[in-house]
Amino acid sequence: MNSWTEAIGEEKVQPYFQQLLQQVYQARASGKIIYPPQHEVFSAFALTDFKAVKVVILGQDPYHGPNQAHGLAFSVKPSVVPPPSLVNIYKELAQDIAGFQVPSHGYLIDWAKQGVLLLNTVLTVQQGMAHSHATLGWEIFTDKVIAQLNDHRENLVFLLWGSHAQKKGQFINRSRHCVLTAPHPSPLSAHRGFFGCQHFSKANAYLQSKGIATINWQLPLVV
């Protein structure tokens, strides 16, 4: 199994998925502002192919402010100030990775291109309404994505931050993959153990131990 088409192509023709897409389409057509824009909903899959995935970082649902979400978990468009959770991710990187310099932006596309699947478990949201699309069926779809990675890839690193991601990843085969857990990087919980978790260096140490090229976590300082 080499591509997302092979991995989840059949899922996209399931009735629940067609109904889900129709609900999102109707919401947009009725004038509601839905993030991310339609052409970016599946960006995580377009940028990181199935056979290229090395690390999976699970988010929850997209940012719900203007111009933030573009289809990659935790990432924002280049012109947007990094949100608090991403600021805390950068703080941990600066502690964990020698020489890491905090960029001026929150655009994580360089990670995606190296094999970091930045996957939200719900792929759309209505402006200003967190979790507004949580019951549409996205969770069924992203469960399938994780199951296919679990079953048809090996030696992946899953970074599960917060209880939602940890529950979502509870069935991942720990003998086949590396699963690292920590509190969410949100300001509400980062001090409970996200800071100091060293997940970025641990991910690279695991990849290296399996003979897999590591991730360069350093992002361009400006974009």
From Swiss-Prot:
Active site (UniProt): 61 (proton acceptor)
Chemical reaction(s) catalysed: Hydrolyzes single-stranded DNA or mismatched double-stranded DNA and polynucleotides, releasing free uracil
GO CC annotations, alphabetized: cytoplasm
Database matches in SMART domains: UDG, UreE_C
GO biological process, one term: base-excision repair, AP site formation via deaminated base removal
Assigned EC number: 3.2.2.27
Family: Belongs to the uracil-DNA glycosylase (UDG) superfamily. UNG family.
Function: Excises uracil residues from the DNA which can arise as a result of misincorporation of dUMP residues by DNA polymerase or due to deamination of cytosine.
Protein name per the record: Uracil-DNA glycosylase
Gene from which this protein is expressed: ung
